[in-house]
């Protein structure tokens, strides 16, 4: 040993890594024995010092990082901004989730990096610091949880919980944080229990696969290699690790000079020389390149990990490899127990500005993009230098390539502001998985979208659409009401309605009494009980309210006065309004007796002589069965076509028998319907008295003649009351059979000259005994007064023209002549229905063909009435209606319920609204025509942008209208902004009238009607427009039904701003985002769609935007109604999972078992198939299969090795590549004989080794078709040469039975077979003597010649075809295909 004086004294802290280096150098220099002696001394020293120091940990040693407060605050601020963006529709839910996770993760990481410097500066001798950072006990993440911030936890599935734990364990957790933290802790406990066994099983399977691989030769003579080059973006450390301990496969030249020879062992010196010389790709030998089938040679394996020399012959390298991979798993599962499920994932690092100042960079080097969080940013491709100029200092910040720059040029930044985001490099491992995320609608309404949407090809007929580009989906608010209870709804587009009269909530139809008759809505819920007044109430002015004392009918016909009343009267005349009521007391009946049912066609259009309403008069109601007859002369029953009502689904009435008659007769009879099996106690045609027993439990109510008729399954038993006459033979009464005889007519027989006072019905009855008799029955007579013309009830219009609406009262019989009427038990039959028929005189040119109806609600004091309003229209001009699917031109059919009708009541006919429950109906497009959907827009769904006073407006025709700001007290109302529901805030549709106050002269002048109706309708002269769902715009003027394009109408608002005039263009149907600037009065408060554009204001229907990115799937159709909680969009995105080893081990296992769960392995399999097809096609059969399989296998081998290494490296576990290579070689060494060509040797579907397939093909000179296949480790263990090894692994009985049937032979080459049978194990480094030296070295020249011949042929073929598949095979394709690795190398492919 050298003298003590000569020794160098190192004053330096030695931590774990330094210790490793020291030991390895000691071994290199002094050998094993000496090193162990020195290490003993080091150990003793360590224990001695530890005892003397006796480090203890107190709670005061845990120092919290001072910068934590503002970091957390900063993160919370960012989350808040993010929430706002999401609300505005700038960021969708996935981006939001992703970003909030990254915000918190970055904060947590930043704190973790601050930890060490903080301790070093404030308290370097802190025991926590000493222990954790020396590597003695505890790691950074545990200390980080104690003094930094606990951060994001992952639940037992490895999914992230997106609520971060902001406290650390020193400060203590809040209740929520504690519960979330328990999630993570539970994960730790579960992992310790379950995953340990998993790791053990993994080790067992791995060893099973490779137990027979032993080093048997020195050199297999392969000329293949795998290229490794540091240029491929591989980290230098990994490059060195890959090379050290390998053997070169080829000479390496630097220019003309050879710097390393083939089969030379690579040590650290050689690696350094390569790096200095920047040698081009270095070809090395790996277990992949070894040519021996079931073992491996020394040169391909390389250095033995135990002692730094080439591996010895007879070493069981397979078992060593299996254990090296499996063992870290067992160790690592235990480690997660301490950190307890804290989420670790790779995220982008942030670059923060060093000081305040103005930022500058070269804009040519960046280009704009959208980050994965939905932020606008700049992407830089090369290193970017950013300068931040303060007054006196200039800071330079270097931003690495592929980073996002989050600031603009010349922007002022504050100190510590995030200016850039560095993309996470390849070194940090992110487990990604594809996740579908459904976004559910949080409000109800209809769906619109702002771009074209493609149908997904597999769902051509469904409602799943794919988005081609980023766009917004809008949910336009409104309460949907699906009218599936009744076949159609009385309400039409743009009708006013009380939301409570037709209950909006799904499921509860509390105030909607529905029968199978579709017209019986209790829509008209006016309570007139306090308002019954007799006589005609006359008021000053032409307006009249007429009441006839019963409270059933109230007609209002308001006339209109205006200075140009002539024009207006023409436009607004010809409508009248009927209020309806029902009696509250009798609400339990389905239909109030005196109530009127209204009958409106589905499309709201009346033809002439249509029936408008009907009511059932109680006088014409019978409770017994019978027959109706119409008068003596039956020719009277004239059926008029237009008087019929077409009922759909009405079971009660048979409308085809409806006729207008003057009087009719009802012949009562008693009817019993008995089942066919019941025994009848009376005979047919017998006469019985009252209360006779007919059947077992049936008694007759009246006496008379019994008729029994047998129908298919039942017996009908009728009892006629009345007299029976047996006429003589000479009587000619036979002609009276089945007729009605008026009173006063006597019989022809003089003997019985009897006169009847009432009408009678004579019916001849012929019993079986040929003697007939006549039954004379009593008849109930009904007289029906002829129709009254109700047109007289309406005041004549001032400018009377002949096309006024008239109403006639007409009575209809509901049953046909002579038809039997069956009374169902305890219900009464309505014989006559009173109808109101709508009529109007034909105009001279006959143009008025139809009348339109709509509902209006008028509120008088506290009373609400529903009115129906009828409107005459000239027949429509032909339009061209453009729909998204068909463009049809021509008249719009009357019953076009599949497209919104063009109704003249498009303007909102609300008179005064209740605060909440008032709404306007919008009809929706629906695919099925039977069930029409409505949406009710109530006041809470619309808001109005107030009048822009004092501004000038130009519309497209350059007319400028100046609003007059009169000092009028009523104008001030209009300036308030508010929801649409409160009357003054509607875009001046209606205004509340106080006593005789005159508005601006552009509004109509109306007398106030002595407080009866405080509110009437005003029609303004100024036009406003409405938009329906298809984007068509209507003028609500019944005579000018012109349809404009939505783009024809843009209003520009010119703001008088301080410096410049900006002009906003607003078009109908445009969507406005929240806080978008429209007027100079400040931003718009709510997002929504412009519904009505007015000269000085807008009405906006509130809507909620949802952002959707390309590739997202939209559910539902355009314009479809969505309810709360319906699926709106589905995003597919990649999501990080937590990256601890417990997620890692299953990943390793999945890779080794080749389960195609993630996109990577699926891609691998697809790539495999693609290669196989292409190469076979290009080169032809035998070589094609060979090369195809080899290239495929080579590709997949490398990517498998990289994937497994990635998992372990991320955990800081170093496993040498060659261990993984040995296992991967076994997984990929088999090929599957395919069915393409039959060969004599192998049957299709058989698994054979690749080398065996090649050799057999060469020997037989016959093409064997096969393709590469990836087997999992379990399948590989069950597909070995030895059935004993397979049987001892799994499925013993099956394996042994098959082997016996096939007569398999086990050559006992592996370790396991010999262990099972108790023989000698054919491994061990002392085994050399048994290997025949002669076979190793004295290769016969013939063999060598054959080998070279094949290689030469191979090379020629490859060079000849290089141009053809240059795309598939790289340029430095070396001797054979294995070297196609050049382009992958050992970096992540």
UniProtKB/Swiss-Prot annotation:
Instruction: Kindly give the InterPro entries that the UniProt entry links to this protein.
Output: DNA-dir_RpoC2_beta_pp, RNA_pol_beta''_euk, RNA_pol_Rpb1_3_sf, RNA_pol_Rpb1_4, RNA_pol_Rpb1_5, Rpb1_funnel_sf
Asked whether the keyword Chloroplast is assigned, the reply is: yes
Q: Might you name a Gene Ontology BP term for this protein?
A: DNA-templated transcription
**Quaternary structure and interacting proteins, as annotated:** In plastids the minimal PEP RNA polymerase catalytic core is composed of four subunits: alpha, beta, beta', and beta''. When a (nuclear-encoded) sigma factor is associated with the core the holoenzyme is formed, which can initiate transcription.
Binding residue positions for Zn(2+) = 220, 290, 297, 300
| GO CC, alphabetical | chloroplast; DNA-directed RNA polymerase complex; mitochondrion
Q: Which Gene3D superfamilies match?
A: 1.10.132.30, 1.10.150.390, 1.10.1790.20, RNA polymerase Rpb1, domain 3
Cofactor(s) annotated in UniProt: Zn(2+)
Concerning its family, UniProt says: Belongs to the RNA polymerase beta' chain family. RpoC2 subfamily.
Write one Pfam family the protein is assigned to: RNA_pol_Rpb1_5
Q: Which Enzyme Commission number(s) are on file for it?
A: 2.7.7.6
Q: What class of enzyme is it?
A: transferase
| Keyword entries, A-Z | Chloroplast, DNA-directed RNA polymerase, Metal-binding, Nucleotidyltransferase, Plastid, Transcription, Transferase, Zinc
Secretion signal, residue range per the UniProt entry: none
Q: Which organism is it from?
A: Chloranthus spicatus (Chulantree)
Function noted in UniProt? DNA-dependent RNA polymerase catalyzes the transcription of DNA into RNA using the four ribonucleoside triphosphates as substrates.
Localization, UniProt: Plastid, Chloroplast
List the catalysed reactions.
Answer: RNA(n) + a ribonucleoside 5'-triphosphate = RNA(n+1) + diphosphate
Name of the molecule in the record: DNA-directed RNA polymerase subunit beta''
Molecular functions (GO terms): DNA binding; DNA-directed RNA polymerase activity; zinc ion binding
> Could you give the cofactor binding note from the entry?
Binds 1 Zn(2+) ion per subunit.
